[in-house]
Amino acid sequence: VPGVTLLETETGFAALVSPDSKIARDNARYQEQFGGEPITILLSGPLDSIFSTQNLAVLSDFEQEFSGNEWYHAINGPLTILQLARQEAEQAMRAFEEQLALAQEQAAAEARAAAAAMGCNEAEQEMAAQQARAEVLQKLQPQIEQMQLIGQPSLDNPAFIASVLYDAEGAVSPVMQSFIPDIAHALISVTPRGNMSDQESLQAVIDIETFFSSHPLDGVKVTVASAAKLVDAISNSIGNNIKVLLALSVAVMVLILVFTFRVRWRLLSLLMVGLSALWTFGLMGYLGVPVTMATMAALTILLGLGIDFSIQFHNRYQEEVARGKTIGEAMVTSISNMFPTIGIALLATIIGFITLYISEVPMIRQFGMMLATGIVISYIVALFLLHSIVYLGDKRIEIKKLKEAASKASGRIERILLRLGRLAIDHTLWIFIVAVAFAVGGGIVDHWLPTNTDYEDLMPQSTPALVELREMRQIVGIGGTVRLMVEAGDVTTPAVLGWLKDYGDNALSAHPEIISASSLATVVSTAAGGVIPAQPQIDAILESTPQSYLAPLLSGDRSMAGVSFNIEYIPMEETHDLLVLLQEEASPPSGVRVSPVGSLALGASTMDALVGARMTMNLICLGAILLVLLVVYRRLGSIIFTIIPVGAVIAWSSLDMYLIGIPLNPLTAVMGVLIIGICTEFMVLLMGRYEEEKRRGAPPQEAMVTAISKIGRAITTTALTTLGGFGVLIASSFVMIRDFGIATVISVFLSLLITITVMPGLIVWYDNWKIRRASR
């Protein structure tokens, strides 16, 4: 329990992208230079209210306070432009005053000289000079009146503010349009320090919200949106959903065990798996393994496999008691028969899960490690603790009563399974044909399954942070920003800037989803009239450009430049394709490197690492299990009949997901591992009991029918318990968890179906064929 309290949730990109991957290293260097993902502050209200003297004073205090905070890299907004305009206006006023004075003195000197040449006295010369000064003043009167109309360049002067905000026609001036999307909103962009942890990024947002809570803007609503808030909302949603749904799942499991597993201590298996899960998560806490979406999915597999271990041991014990054995004899027989069989299933599954450690995705590696550890703990608990509790509870009860109770509990389900087993064996061919048809269909449509790794589509759609973000996108008209990092010895040379300008122009024309492009080439070409000038002019432009404009575009040593493409909101799959095309189309000059960076690039990269590698992971996992079974069984038939159903169920699940419309997401992408674990165990248990019955002298058909009726009760109880418990997930408001619940129910049901209907007939047919061949 103390270890569980140490668990921390990780839902950011650290769970999806290895810090050693190229894109993660590139992104870290980019953020070190240009800061992290921007925090957007949306000011909603009439522009006159937003830019009132009182509110501008608050915004000025905000910039002063947060600009001096080491957590913030840069702040850009309308106030930034107003302050630059004020500085430029003050400089212009001083220059105008100096120009006016110089022009007046020059005109006065010329007038005085002309008067002297005409023989005028000193008084007449002074009058001529005064007249010349007045004429200069009159000539510049329009400019003077305009300056007087605007007044002193100050944030306390509404006329000056209006002159910066609006053009001559009264529309928002071009320089302000990037921060004022319409007449009722304004934007402030705050770039936090790069490479902050999720908690630090969230705190940076909270600090901003706290400032505006304590310094409210008059008549203006302030909304702060950021990726950090979305990550926090996802984390909270996962936690809250899992807590409620897990409680409901346990309640449903209790009901199913009560009605289907009619033995003494029928809820003991649930207690055992609960303890196993608690110990596993506690160990995670001590080892510092975070809770991610994948590790939450692992809980499903642990409960499914763990409860099966306990039910199988408990079921075999009840079977031996029903045969009239003493408690000690029943316990020994149960353990001696089930220990190796379940041990084989355990070993094969562990090896399969360990292979997940080759994944590039951190949370998949943690997923595999947690599963391997968890099922070992579940096995140990079922083997020792469950038997100890049952022994202590039953040893004082008369064996006759225990036998009667065990016999009564075994009757109904076993009779149903006996009939089902005979039916499956009698109709092997048709069942096999249908199974193969569905498997082929699943293999075909598997490549057609839609992919969705966009957290926004997978989380509860009514989450305030998501609603705010979508409202802001609608107002701003931008769905996201694709960022690229350009590196060279000097990115400010005409050759590099010329290529960068052409690259941006071509991207805008080739990809309609790109709304605008921003780069160092944009700044230079705009200042130079639409062209890239020679190096001296470039240096002069960069020297005169305010640092607030250059900060997100150029590093101090001129070796790195940032490029950003504002795009419409498109699915992550399309974003991934766009990034691939942008990289292919770059064709940079020699010595220039282009690398994708930023949250969209990181998110898109997970599609290949998580979803794209899904089939590879499944094949490696299956291959590892095959090797283990080969070492253990050393019989090709047993190995094939254990592996084939696993592959078939994976294909069936793909077909069902395609027909239902469930996409591949970070959770459903690991469903293959769940199927491999559950189905492998079911088949190993069935094959183990089948071989046991054959050793007792039963012919193949009778041996299989007995195996289905005996092992099938425990398998069916396991499947129904898992189905009922995790069917509750379907009610989740978290789209990703809901889809995972549906996929889990489908996978467990199909694993049960193939174990008791498809494979028994094939196994019996194969053994009968071997007998016939041997008798010839």
Question: Where on the chain are the PLM-derived regions?
Answer:
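Extracytoplasmic
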Residues: 122-263, 498-501, 505, 542-625
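Hydrophobic alpha-helical segments
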Residues: 280-399, 731-732
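Hydrophobic transmembrane alpha-helices
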Residues: 257, 274, 290-311, 354, ...
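Pore- and gate-forming transmembrane helices of large, multi-pass membrane proteins
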Residues: 240-244, 270, 309, 322-359, ...
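Juxtamembrane segments of multi-pass membrane proteins
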Residues: 7-10, 16-17, 22-26, 32-40, ...
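Hydrophobic, glycine/alanine-rich multi-pass transmembrane helices and their short helix-loop junctions
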Residues: 256, 343-393, 626-630, 652-663, ...
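Interfacial helix-loop-helix hairpins and adjacent transmembrane helices
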Residues: 1-2, 28, 332, 380-439, ...
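Interfacial segments of transmembrane alpha-helices in multi-pass membrane proteins
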Residues: 236-291, 358-362, 616-665, 731
